[in-house]
């Protein structure tokens, strides 16, 4: 360990974040390595180590001969201060070596509020911020993750973007880099070759021009780059990598358990949900393989909790059979199975009993909207009756805590829809009174609302976010309407949601704003301890750009959007059709009921695994 680090660690919070040495961390002999990869997560250790995608790609890269992938996380403020004071560059956990010793610096970016953390980590690593300043092959700075479906705000800082699922594409990129270095290519030669790989977007190979009103006038590829870059997917989930020997963190993290991915994609088609669109098509992992991974992961790590994870886990066809298969093993080892947010329309007592075999926790449902009219607009095909029946089932089975998630500011929302949220909570309370076997325990109902953020590649990508003032008015309206003492109301901070809406649909000009805000001190914007909207507004003002242009403006369907060179596999025509259906309050059936022709099926030969 670096002597400077030894002196620093006693002075910072949670020093275990920075020392590595965890069980299952990969260590290799440097003399046998020709390519080193710094896999960076632009958030804290606790958040990054909870990310399944990072665990998967860490394993994929470390299975390559001659390649060593190491982890790097954004330091907390106290650690950053100590690093800068000691003039100690950012380092990787496995070896402790500075990031400048690495060939490839790869960022996993799932959230727009992490953009300034990317700049901060590059600076802490003593790596030039701008891609144009990094003229050699080393380091090659790449980024992937769902936030990269619109990478334009950070286009000036990233050499290339990996779109979609990275298990196969990451290997191809690393091998291409090794070829480039072995044959003495220039960086431009490498970037031009990378752009020919399916799923690779190279920002510097696209010229973007603007109209006088600030909208994009043209996106022009050059040097043979494709006009449209389509994401990559894993075709067969049974052949895809799963991190059975996952790293066991040395300090508590957010998701400190085995995360078992059952399938990718979603059959439901909620019109606001970016993940539901960009992870299409549906591809399932076989039940037997899921069970095998569960047993082996628990045996190896000692974890006693397993999350059965997918976008809509209860839509996994053999879910009940999987729980049956795992029942004996989990009972013997005192392992609990848990699910993330459940759908109210397919929740059952049978499923609940299997979950209750372990530690019985509260249940979470996401109705998203307070009235059926608005649920139809967003294609959340769940009725109030279905929600209440699920709650009755849960309360009768001994559950006494329910969390309900909603959004405020959805397209066409009215005050009646907002007040409908309070009505839903009251009806859930009434369902408890009707169904609970032991009323002495009481009940806890938590209503949480977030501010709707329109996202690229969704049916609502053209919509405006409501103003901050209007959002806060609706929050207050709902606060006053929730009068039951057993109902707790939590709402999301408005400032971060506003900036998220700006960055999510931003263009390349926001790169100047990002850098200006970072130089003013922005770095861990996903954390309220460090976020300052005033700092960002000053940066916008200095750069002569209006954030409301990005967040609060309805786009014409004819407008060329900044991310128009990127395809998630879902066609623009389908997204427009879904938008029109929304305004007509017409729902679209789920993919299992009827193929709606979104286009994603063409990524898997024409037929989805629904």
PLM regions: where:
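N-terminal [4Fe-4S]-dependent radical SAM core
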Residues: 8-38, 45-46, 203, 209, ...
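A short beta-strand-loop structural module common to alpha/beta enzyme folds
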Residues: 66-78
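Conserved SAM/AdoMet-binding glycine-rich loop
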Residues: 40, 113, 295-403, 407-446, ...
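Radical SAM enzyme core and accessory elements
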Residues: 1-27, 31, 37-39, 483-610
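N-terminal pre-triad scaffold of radical SAM enzymes
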Residues: 39-43, 61, 248-274, 298, ...
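Canonical Radical SAM [4Fe-4S] cluster-binding loop centered on the CxxxCxxC motif
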Residues: 51, 252-288, 594-610
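Flexible glycine/acidic-rich beta-alpha junction loops that bind and position SAM and/or redox cofactors
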Residues: 77-78, 153, 207-211, 317-318, ...
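Glycine-rich beta-alpha loop elements in corrinoid/cobalamin-binding modules
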Residues: 75-222, 459-507, 515-529
């Amino acid at each position: 360990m670096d002597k400077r680090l030894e002196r620093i660690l006693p002075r910072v919070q949670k020093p275990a974040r920075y020392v590595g040495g965890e069980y299952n961390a990969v260590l290799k002999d440097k003399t046998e390595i020709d390519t080193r990869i710094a896999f960076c997560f632009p958030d804290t250790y606790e958040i990054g180590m909870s990310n399944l995608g990072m665990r998967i790609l860490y394993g994929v890269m470390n299975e390559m001969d001659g390649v060593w992938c190491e982890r790097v996380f954004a330091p907390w403020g106290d650690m950053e201060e100590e690093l800068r004071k000691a003039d100690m560059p950012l380092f990787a956990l496995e070896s402790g070596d500075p990031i400048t010793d690495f060939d490839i610096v790869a960022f996993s970016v799932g959230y727009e509020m992490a953009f300034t953390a990317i700049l901060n980590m590059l600076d802490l690593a003593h790596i030039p911020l701008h891609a144009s300043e990094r003229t050699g092959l080393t380091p090659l700075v790449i980024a992937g993750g769902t936030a990269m479906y619109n990478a334009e705000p950070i286009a000036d800082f990233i050499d290339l973007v990996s779109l979609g699922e990275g298990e196969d594409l990451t290997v191809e990129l690393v091998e291409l880099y090794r070829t480039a270095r072995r044959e003495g290519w220039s960086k431009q030669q490498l970037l031009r070759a990378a752009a020919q790989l399916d799923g690779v977007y190279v920002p510097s190979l696209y010229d973007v021009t603007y109209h006088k009103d600030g909208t994009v006038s043209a996106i022009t590829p050059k040097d043979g780059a494709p006009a449209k870059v389509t994401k990559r997917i894993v075709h067969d989930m049974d052949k895809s990598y799963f991190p059975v020997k996952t790293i066991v963190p040395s300090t508590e993290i957010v998701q400190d358990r085995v995360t078992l991915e059952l399938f990718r994609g979603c059959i439901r088609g909620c019109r606001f949900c970016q993940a539901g669109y960009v992870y299409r098509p549906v591809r399932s992992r076989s039940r037997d393989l899921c069970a095998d991974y569960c047993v082996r992961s628990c045996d190896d790590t000692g974890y006693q909790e397993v999350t059965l994870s997918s976008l809509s886990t209860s839509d996994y066809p053999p879910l009940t059979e999987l729980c049956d298969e795992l029942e004996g093993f989990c009972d013997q080892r005192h392992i609990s199975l848990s699910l993330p947010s459940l759908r109210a329309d397919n929740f059952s007592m049978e499923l609940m009993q299997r979950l209750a075999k372990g530690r019985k926790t509260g249940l979470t449902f996401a109705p998203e909207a307070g009235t059926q009219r608005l649920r139809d607009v967003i294609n959340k095909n769940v009725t109030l009756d279905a929600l209440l029946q699920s709650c009755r089932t849960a309360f009768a089975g001994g559950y006494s805590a329910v969390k309900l998630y909603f959004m405020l500011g959805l397209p066409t929302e009215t005050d009646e829809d907002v007040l409908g949220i309070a009505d839903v909570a009251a009806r859930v309370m009434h369902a408890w009174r009707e169904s609970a076997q032991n009323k002495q325990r009481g009940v806890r109902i938590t209503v949480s609302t977030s501010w709707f953020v329109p996202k690229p590649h969704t049916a609502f990508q053209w919509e405006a976010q409501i103003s901050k003032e209007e959002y806060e008015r609706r929050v207050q309206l709902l606060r006053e309407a929730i009068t039951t003492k057993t109902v707790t109301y939590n709402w999301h901070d408005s400032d971060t949601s506003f900036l998220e809406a700006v960055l999510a649909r931003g263009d390349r000009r926001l790169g100047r704003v990002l850098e200006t805000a970072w130089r003013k001190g922005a770095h861990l914007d996903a954390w309220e301890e460090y976020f300052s909207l005033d700092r960002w507004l000053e940066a916008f003002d200095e750069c002569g750009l209006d954030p409301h242009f990005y967040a609060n403006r309805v786009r014409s369907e004819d407008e060329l959007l900044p991310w128009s060179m990127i395809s998630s596999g879902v066609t623009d025509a389908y997204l427009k059709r879904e938008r029109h259906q929304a305004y007509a309050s017409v729902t679209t059936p789920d993919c299992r009921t009827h193929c709606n022709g979104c286009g994603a099926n063409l990524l898997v030969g024409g037929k989805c695994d629904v």
